Amino acid sequence: MSIELDLQLAVENEHGLPSEAEFALWLSRTITPFQPQAEVTVRIVDEAESHALNLNYRGKDKPTNVLSFPFEAPPGMEMDLLGDLVICRQVVEREAIEQNKPLQAHWAHMVVHGSLHLLGYDHIEDDEAEEMESLETEIMQEMGFTDPYLAEKE
């Protein structure tokens, strides 16, 4: 069982970012219960790139915390490539402050959330959102973090 991480740091300042080992751990804890072998690219970007991708792929004219791009192999081809996560540093940092969450916990949550999207989970419908949030909470707590949705539940 292993998750292969391709970490891309496309930010002006890399200081204070989680380590490659932390990203790998968060991916592994999220993905391996569902898929024991996988390759995932995690790209950390600044707001301009996040904004452009969010506008191009989702029609949203603003940067966002995490974008997930699942990979679909052509029929008959078996590949471990799960997909790409694009995480915006400034949005994650701003949200952590606004939501009064430890920064490291919010980074972990974005990796967990994005990874579940790569695995096919979504939160468009209420029942899907409930299932996905429950999984996120369980995974985060298994890693020693608090429930990322605690403030919303109070």
Swiss-Prot record:
Transmembrane segments: none annotated. GO terms for biological process: rRNA processing. PROSITE patterns: UPF0054. The keyword Secreted does not apply. The keyword Cytoplasm applies. GO terms for cellular component: cytoplasm. Zn(2+) binds at H113, H117, H123. Its cofactor is Zn(2+). It holds the Pfam family YbeY. Binds 1 zinc ion. It is an enzyme of class 3 (hydrolase). InterPro entries: MetalPrtase_cat_dom_sf_prd, YbeY, YbeY_CS. Belongs to the endoribonuclease YbeY family. Single strand-specific metallo-endoribonuclease involved in late-stage 70S ribosome quality control and in maturation of the 3' terminus of the 16S rRNA. PANTHER family: ENDORIBONUCLEASE YBEY, CHLOROPLASTIC (PTHR46986:SF1). This is Endoribonuclease YbeY. The lineage of its organism: Bacteria, Pseudomonadati, Pseudomonadota, Gammaproteobacteria, Vibrionales. The gene is ybeY.
